[in-house]
Amino acid sequence: MEQYKRILLKEFDSRQKVITELTNLEAILNLPKGTELYISDIHGEFEAFDYILRSCAGILNEKIKDCFGDSLSQDDKNRLSALVSYPELVLKEGNKSRDWYKDTIPQLLSLLAFAAAKYSRSKLRKALPPQYAYIIEELVYSDTALADKKSYFENILSYVIELREAVPFILGISGSIRRLLIDHLHVVGDIFDRGAGSPQVMDELLHFHSLDIQWGNHDIIWMGGFFGSKACMLNALRIAARYGYLWDIEKAYGLNLRALTLFADRTYKTNPKFRPILGHREVDFTAEEILQLEKVHQALTIIQFKLESQLIKRRPEFQMEDQVTLDKIDYWEECLTIDDKKHPLINTCFQTIDPTNPSELSPEEAQAVDSMLASFQGSLKLAEHINLLMKKGSMYKIYNQHLLFHGCIPLEPSGEFQPLMIHQAHYVGRKLLDFFEYHIRQAAKNKEIGDDFSTDLIWYCWRGKLSPLFGKDKMTTLERYFIEDKETHKEVENSYFSYRNSEKICQLILEEFGLFSQESRMVNGHTPVKTGKGESPIRGGGLLFVIDGGLCEAYQEKTGTAGYSLLNNSYGFQLVTHQPFQNAQKVVEAPFAQTSLKKVIENVEQRTLIKSTSIGQILMAQQQELFALLHEFYDF
């Protein structure tokens, strides 16, 4: 503590400096809070995710309307919206004249000033591109109603254009506008899997100015694989093969899948059940490429099932002996008995299975797995992405008195918290999530060991009965591949998913996490909201928002929308309903046609100031430290 005081004294070495900083902090605390965007279940759909950020989930169009009113035509508003959202595309369209720049840049500066109105000058300065910060500030705060200032403004603008700096200048201003409109981003899990663009999503998050992440079940298998869990890695790669983006992942992360590909090509033949699900991307694949993915998909699936059988045997404390594994198959009759009913097997690809020891890897499989793991853990880009997940991520987040988590808080059928009994201890509610997070961080410390308890527990997070990220009694992947009877495919959801409609239970969960404010809410992802069937994203008497992004094209037929995101500004919450995203060019051509539908959920009685937020708590703590300094050293 004494050392900290010495550091503080070095920075604030006079009474006036302390007073100035206290005044600055008080000014910031009394400004309105910034706008937060909550988004979930991106599932590798980079372009749709990128559009939500570029359009600021519809806020951009609203700000343009509010800023310019009737002074701009609808066509001009369209063009301005497209420019701020996708400046790179708009600036490439045709040759822009000097007059176009002289008309457009002042509009951008007006919009920037409008977006910055509720922030301090310091906040605006931090949002500006450093190379243009001084000049943009000068232009933003110039009163062009005064003749001298108008001339000053026009001269600076002309000089920027003459220096051929107009394009990077516009790019910088557009980025600053978007940054001011979304002050903080919450990603409520499942960045990975289904779509090919997870690496691009992670790259964008790496450079986002302020964010937090709540881990999802599909994120956890990538983390587990990187930390040494072969079972997690095989799940991640199998899903990539199933949805046809394995080669995209291989290229993006520099993975070496050659040993796997050669082994699969030698061992397997065509099997329609393992044909990749490509959707509209099927036209991009040749018949040979599809066959190759079929073979690789089979290889990854069988290896995954072998590794999972080994893990379940290794971890009796997981209490998963009732799960269907390769050991329970009758290979002579090719059938599987579940609940005393015998089921014939279909789509089988058991070439490498020894019926006397089904979970043992063949030498070629073992070599392929070792090669994949070395490649997985050796990828610099993947390491960068996993580091971001660890630095910004957690099992849950309490932010501004709201509770964010991806999956569920396991509950008994009675509505009580469901305990995980393990190693002579039991964990429920908040302690259950803390238990999993502790072991995930332990596994990250030593990725050379892949079969320790902490690393195995990451795999349990993926599919364990009491995993807050999974939320079902079992995962029936093996049954779905090899048994026709759909009764065997059923996965029963945890009681949480029915109880989350109860205001009483939602209040109980909030209080479990120390949240007793009437303004506190929960934000949850994981399960698509089936709007077409009358489901609402608002649950529990308004205490819970379910915001599965629905960006994944495969879900949109079920949901009837491209999902939801949530906005929270100083006036309250707004629920945003997204329409299916086509492509960036369509947005450039008709940005207001893509406008997201907003629903104001609740307005606060008084505008929320920074002093009432999580950041405000940090700033007020700094104030207390400075007051203590003032009293102790400057005779205040």
UniProtKB/Swiss-Prot annotation:
Its cofactor is Mn(2+). It catalyses: beta-D-fructose 1,6-bisphosphate + H2O = beta-D-fructose 6-phosphate + phosphate. Keywords: Carbohydrate metabolism, Hydrolase, Manganese. The keyword Manganese applies. Its EC number is 3.1.3.11. GO terms for molecular function: fructose 1,6-bisphosphate 1-phosphatase activity. SUPFAM superfamilies: Metallo-dependent phosphatases (SSF56300). It is an enzyme of class 3 (hydrolase). Pfam families: FBPase_2 (PF06874). GO terms for biological process: gluconeogenesis. The keyword Manganese applies. Pathway: Carbohydrate biosynthesis; gluconeogenesis. Belongs to the FBPase class 3 family. This is Fructose-1,6-bisphosphatase class 3. The lineage of its organism: Bacteria, Bacillati, Bacillota, Bacilli, Lactobacillales.
